[in-house]
């Protein structure tokens, strides 16, 4: 995994690990991007207000990279994180699970003081 941040000359600069975007999650994202038929897509992970615990995670495909986005690259797949969401996601792990309870992306976040039962919202 490699974390990239745009620099003044637009060339990505490697940074220390900010977030663990697992190979399993990257493989699932790659399959979803392939199904969309647009290789320019990246997965955006963001935090917004809402959910039963105050904040909730969201995912969306995006073909645009904002100037202040962090780019976490694993196995050639890019995960984008906006500046506001960064403060809530430092040290988190983004994984993909496929088990008896179904398939889903799972975020293990050391910044979350509590989470809801479904795991899609949290408080800090």
From Swiss-Prot:
Residues at which iron-sulfur cluster binds: 52, 116, 118
Pfam families: Fe-S_biosyn
Cofactor note: Binds 1 iron-sulfur cluster per subunit.
Keyword line: Iron, Iron-sulfur, Metal-binding
Keyword check for Metal-binding: yes
Protein name as catalogued: Putative iron-sulfur cluster insertion protein ErpA 2
PANTHER family: IRON-SULFUR CLUSTER ASSEMBLY 2 HOMOLOG, MITOCHONDRIAL
Transcription listed as a keyword: no
The family this protein is said to belong to: Belongs to the HesB/IscA family.
Function, in words: Required for insertion of 4Fe-4S clusters.
Coiled coil: none
Cofactor field: iron-sulfur cluster
Protein origin, superkingdom: Bacteria
Any one GO CC term of the record: cytosol
Source organism of this protein record: Burkholderia vietnamiensis (strain G4 / LMG 22486)
GO molecular function: 2 iron, 2 sulfur cluster binding; 4 iron, 4 sulfur cluster binding; iron ion binding
Phylogenetic lineage: Bacteria, Pseudomonadati, Pseudomonadota, Betaproteobacteria, Burkholderiales
Quaternary structure and partners: Homodimer.
Example GO biological process: iron-sulfur cluster assembly
This protein's encoding gene: erpA2
């Amino acid at each position: 995994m490699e974390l990239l941040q745009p620099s003044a000359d637009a060339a990505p600069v490697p940074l220390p690990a900010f977030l663990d975007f697992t190979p399993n999650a990257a493989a699932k994202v790659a399959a979803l991007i392939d199904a969309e038929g647009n290789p320019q897509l990246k997965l955006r992970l963001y935090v917004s207000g809402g959910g039963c615990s105050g904040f909730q995670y969201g995912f969306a495909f995006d073909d645009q990279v904002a100037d202040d986005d962090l780019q976490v690259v694993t196995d050639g797949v890019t995960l984008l994180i906006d500046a506001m969401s960064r403060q809530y996601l430092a040290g988190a792990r983004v994984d993909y699970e496929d088990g008896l309870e179904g398939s889903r992306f799972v975020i293990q976040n050391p910044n979350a003081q509590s989470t809801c039962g479904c795991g899609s919202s949290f408080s800090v």
